[in-house]
């Protein structure tokens, strides 16, 4: 009796089944598709464990904080009441690349999510320039262990409430705690531990209670002194947490280290939203290609392949703009997969329109090389600007609305002609620009020898001011870390006119 070529023939699975499926998927991914991946670690988890993974933003471990418990309860209540379902998998940008698979998955779904996460996402994490520039996959797990141990030690030494105040403030500012230009310094756990010891030893050696009895000096209020102190402090500075860690006058060394932990973890996540469309599009295209090849070679049967098609169809469903289930923006799985498939088509079977729009790509006969090049060298904004085709614009029935606040109606000002295609492509690409979503808030001045008031500036446009309640709540967190008054001015980026001012003072000592 000859052995069946099928990897499995039922919905049930065991670990030998997973190993056979993984080996077959790996051969196609690496030998046929030319994917380059980190070593994989596959973990099977329960629904309760998946909720824990959700709580920590997909990371396998983290420090204690009340916000994680709150997030766990929100996800748990939504899941238990049937308002939401859990993901089939979660994958972590680390080396080795960790993929969490739900134990409730069928044998087919386990194969699909291994192809999707362990090879699609894994290849993207390893090769995309954003992740190569901003993250250190080999060091993140060790650093998270250090962070958890350090925060726990601070809680034992200084009290949970004191640590919580610093974490609350740092979390509130985490989106303003990343270096957006020039790349990130690679994580080095030994250097971080050495620096933390040196900070503690320095604070102990420099302490002298007599310093508090000396009278203060009056600062010079001249244009030269303002320019000089701003130059000395490296202002303006957009990384608020970095500035707090280095300059805040009242922070102790352990508080500075906690701020550093929060901002380095925020830096690790910085590339993710900038490449979500590409990342999900890459992983979906990869899993669909691999599962199709498994079916073509007789390694999965028709029933399994129908399950693959059903799952993928659900994932890439794009509701219409006026559909009750629709919302602003596009489903990243749907648009990402459509663009990857369209690039493949343009490389192999281009139309005359494709040749006009993509002369360097159309008919080159190398769809895999073209896709790998795109995955490595673009982010969502530039990817849409470079590769969104008229065919995909028509398929998704895209159009552009002009929302003029002085008019009572909306105007459709870009439709399906050459000028409209270009306008739609530019507008959609701009919507993926991270600068369009995060306010440009920078430290612009502080007189450390004077009143120590911290001056922040938000460069914006009339009609695009910060919500007052949110701005004031966030400023209170800034003042908690700074220790003195903080003032935020919202300034017209074109005219330099001050549009609004917000002020916050630090809380009274407990």
Name the predicted role of every residue range.
Residues 135-164, 199, 203, 207, ...:
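Sequence-structural signature of the catalytic-core scaffold of metal-dependent phosphohydrolases
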Residues 124-186, 190, 283-299, 310-321:
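Post-HExxH zinc-binding segment in Zn-dependent metallohydrolases
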Residues 104, 108, 124, 299-510:
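Non-catalytic terminal regions of proteins
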Residues 226-328, 332-333, 337:
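Long, internal scaffold/assembly segments composed of regular secondary structure
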Residues 172-246:
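Extended catalytic-interface subdomain
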Residues 96-114, 269-278:
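Short pre-active-site segment immediately N-terminal to the catalytic Zn-binding motif
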Residues 16-97, 217-251, 488-500:
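Auxiliary, metal-adjacent structural segments of Zn-dependent hydrolase domains
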Residues 108-125, 280-284, 288:
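Active-site recognition of the HExxH zinc-binding catalytic motif
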């Amino acid at each position: 009796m000859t052995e069946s070529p099928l990897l499995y023939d039922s919905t049930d699975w065991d670990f030998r089944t997973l190993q056979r499926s993984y080996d077959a998927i790996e051969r196609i991914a690496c030998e046929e598709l030319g994917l380059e991946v980190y070593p994989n670690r596959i973990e099977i988890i329960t629904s309760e464990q998946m909720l824990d993974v959700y709580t920590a933003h997909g990371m396998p471990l983290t420090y204690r904080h009340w916000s994680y418990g709150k997030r766990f309860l929100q996800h748990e209540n939504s899941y238990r009441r049937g308002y939401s379902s859990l993901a089939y998998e979660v994958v972590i940008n680390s080396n080795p690349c960790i993929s969490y698979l739900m134990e409730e998955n069928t044998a087919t779904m386990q194969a699909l999510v291994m192809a999707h996460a362990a090879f699609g996402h894994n290849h993207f994490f390893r090769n995309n320039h954003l992740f190569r520039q901003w993250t250190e996959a080999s060091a993140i797990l060790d650093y998270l262990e250090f962070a958890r141990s350090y925060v726990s030690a601070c809680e034992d030494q200084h009290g949970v409430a004191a640590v919580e105040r610093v974490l609350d403030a740092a979390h509130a500012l985490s989106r303003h705690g990343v270096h957006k230009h020039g790349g990130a310094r690679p994580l080095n756990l030994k250097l971080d531990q050495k620096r933390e010891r040196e900070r503690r030893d320095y604070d102990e050696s420099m302490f002298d209670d007599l310093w508090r009895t000396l009278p203060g000096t009056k600062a010079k209020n001249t244009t030269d002194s303002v320019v000089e102190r701003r130059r000395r402090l490296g202002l303006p500075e957009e990384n608020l947490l970095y500035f707090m860690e280095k300059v805040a006058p009242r922070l102790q060394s352990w508080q500075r280290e906690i701020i550093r932990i929060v901002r380095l973890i925020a830096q690790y996540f910085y590339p993710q939203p900038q490449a979500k469309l590409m990342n999900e599009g890459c992983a979906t295209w990869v899993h669909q290609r691999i599962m199709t090849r498994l079916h073509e070679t007789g390694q999965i049967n028709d029933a399994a392949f129908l399950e693959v098609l059903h799952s993928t169809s659900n994932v890439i469903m794009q509701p219409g703009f006026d559909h009750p289930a629709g919302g602003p923006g596009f489903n990243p799985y749907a648009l990402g997969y459509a663009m990857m498939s369209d690039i493949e088509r343009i490389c192999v079977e281009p139309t005359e329109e494709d040749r006009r729009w993509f002369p360097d790509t159309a008919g080159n006969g190398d769809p895999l090389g073209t896709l790998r090049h795109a995955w490595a060298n673009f982010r969502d904004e530039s990817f849409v600007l470079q590769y969104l085709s008229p065919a995909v614009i028509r398929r998704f029935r895209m159009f552009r609305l002009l929302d003029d606040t002085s008019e009572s109606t909306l105007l459709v000002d870009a439709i399906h002609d050459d000028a409209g295609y270009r306008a739609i492509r530019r507008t959609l690409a701009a919507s993926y620009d991270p600068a369009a979503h995060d306010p440009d808030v920078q430290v612009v001045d502080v007189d450390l020898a004077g009143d120590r008031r911290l001056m922040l500036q938000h460069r914006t446009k009339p009609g695009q001011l910060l919500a007052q309640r949110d701005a004031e709540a966030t400023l209170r967190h800034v003042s908690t870390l700074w220790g003195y008054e903080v003032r935020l001015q919202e300034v017209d980026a074109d005219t330099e006119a001050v549009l609004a001012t917000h002020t916050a003072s630090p809380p009274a000592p407990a």
